[in-house]
């Protein structure tokens, strides 16, 4: 087991918080493994730690995806499953995990070349699905999600070795300034924030509702925001946000009348598969972090997502 002293991205140990320079590339293989993105788009992703592509999916595709997500949130058989996470203090569904397995159309979405080939291009390798989920923020009562780096959690709680993973968020509703859109700190992917506090047992049961461990300290957050600012990912339904696993991000609550729904697909390099979790922690369940049943994503041959 690697000790905190040997871990280049040590976090949640008995030491104080720290800002650590990233030791991994952002774009692997010079972005030449696939050709879904232009050179300018790859450069923008490498610089900022994220990339917004507007109107990547058609209205017909978005309607089919949104209808499927809404069906899943109403299906008692799915809502009772451990993959379904409710909002703090209510029975409203906040997230559904492993959606690429639970739903045929979302299983096709994760293989859509517009997503999968972009991930393969940036990560410079074949990829697999580390995690997939649908996130909902109903109007008036959708809760916030505090600032965090996904990699901090995936490294500590899942044993992900390196920063060679990315998320893509497919917007299924219009995301505007009022309904709690994703916020990202440009350039924050270049620095790893080591967090304080020992991870409780089965932390995931609480953190998926409200994360309290593995969150950065206010001083580090302020420094990152002063250096890079904060970008709000607003866009029409059908747009997609790709963002690096270490980009600092969060979202406000939704007290507007307009619901927000997104589907997240997390791609990890086949050369970056999980080790045991850090510091003696137990592995999180398979539906949160794919450890056993993984295989390389084979992109679909066409852009035909919706089957007639």
UniProtKB/Swiss-Prot annotation:
Does the record carry Hydrolase as a key word? Answer: no
| Binding of 2-oxoglutarate, residues | 137
Chemical reaction(s) catalysed? L-ectoine + 2-oxoglutarate + O2 = 5-hydroxyectoine + succinate + CO2
Question: Which coenzyme or cofactor does it need?
Answer: Fe(2+)
The record's annotation in InterPro entries points to: EctD (IPR012774), Phytyl_CoA_dOase-like (IPR008775)
**EC supergroup of this enzyme:** oxidoreductase
Q: Known EC number(s)?
A: 1.14.11.55
Locate the residues binding L-ectoine: 131
Query: Which residue positions does the secretion signal occupy?
Result: none
Q: Do the record's keywords include Metal-binding?
A: yes
Which biological process terms from the Gene Ontology are attached to this UniProt entry? ectoine catabolic process
Q: Where does Fe cation bind?
A: 148, 150, 249
Question: Where does the entry annotate site (Important for ectoine stabilization)?
Answer: 154
Q: Name one GO molecular function term.
A: iron ion binding
UniProt keywords (A-Z) are:
Dioxygenase, Iron, Metal-binding, Oxidoreductase
Q: NCBIfam families annotated for this entry?
A: ectoine_ThpD
Q: List the PANTHER family.
A: ECTOINE DIOXYGENASE, PHYTANOYL-COA DIOXYGENASE DOMAIN CONTAINING 1
Question: What family does the database annotate?
Answer: Belongs to the PhyH family. EctD subfamily.
Primary role: Involved in the biosynthesis of 5-hydroxyectoine, called compatible solute, which helps organisms to survive extreme osmotic stress by acting as a highly soluble organic osmolyte. Catalyzes the 2-oxoglutarate-dependent selective hydroxylation of L-ectoine to yield (4S,5S)-5-hydroxyectoine.
Record note on quaternary structure: Homodimer.
Put simply, this protein is called Ectoine dioxygenase
């Amino acid at each position: 087991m690697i000790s905190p002293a040997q871990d280049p991205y040590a976090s949640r140990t008995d030491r104080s918080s720290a800002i650590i320079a990233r030791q991994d590339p952002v774009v692997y293989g010079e972005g030449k493994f696939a050709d879904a993105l232009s050179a300018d788009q790859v450069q923008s992703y490498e610089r900022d730690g994220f990339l917004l592509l507007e109107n990547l999916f058609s209205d017909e595709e978005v309607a089919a995806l949104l209808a499927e997500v809404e069906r899943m949130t109403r299906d008692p058989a799915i809502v009772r499953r451990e993959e379904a996470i409710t909002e703090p203090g209510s029975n409203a569904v906040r997230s559904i995990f492993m959606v690429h397995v639970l739903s045929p159309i979302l299983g096709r979405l994760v293989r859509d070349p517009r997503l999968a080939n972009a991930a393969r291009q940036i990560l410079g390798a074949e990829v697999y699905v580390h995690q997939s989920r649908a996130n909902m923020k109903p109007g008036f009562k959708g809760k916030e999600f505090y600032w965090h780096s996904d990699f901090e959690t995936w490294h500590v709680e899942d044993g992900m070795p390196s920063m060679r993973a990315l998320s893509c968020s497919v917007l299924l509703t219009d995301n505007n300034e009022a309904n709690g859109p994703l916020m990202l700190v440009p350039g924050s992917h270049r620095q790893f924030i080591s967090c304080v506090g020992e991870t409780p047992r089965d932390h995931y049961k609480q953190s998926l509702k409200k994360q309290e461990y593995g969150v950065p300290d206010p001083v580090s957050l302020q420094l990152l925001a002063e250096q890079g600012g904060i970008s709000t990912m607003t866009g029409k339904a059908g747009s997609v946000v790709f963002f690096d696993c270490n980009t600092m991000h969060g979202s406000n609550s939704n007290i507007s009348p307009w619901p927000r729904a997104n589907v997240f697909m997390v791609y990890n390099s086949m050369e970056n598969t999980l080790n045991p979790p850090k510091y003696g922690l137990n592995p999180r369940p398979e539906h949160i972090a794919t450890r056993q049943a993984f295989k390389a994503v084979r992109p679909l041959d066409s852009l035909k997502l919706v089957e007639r």
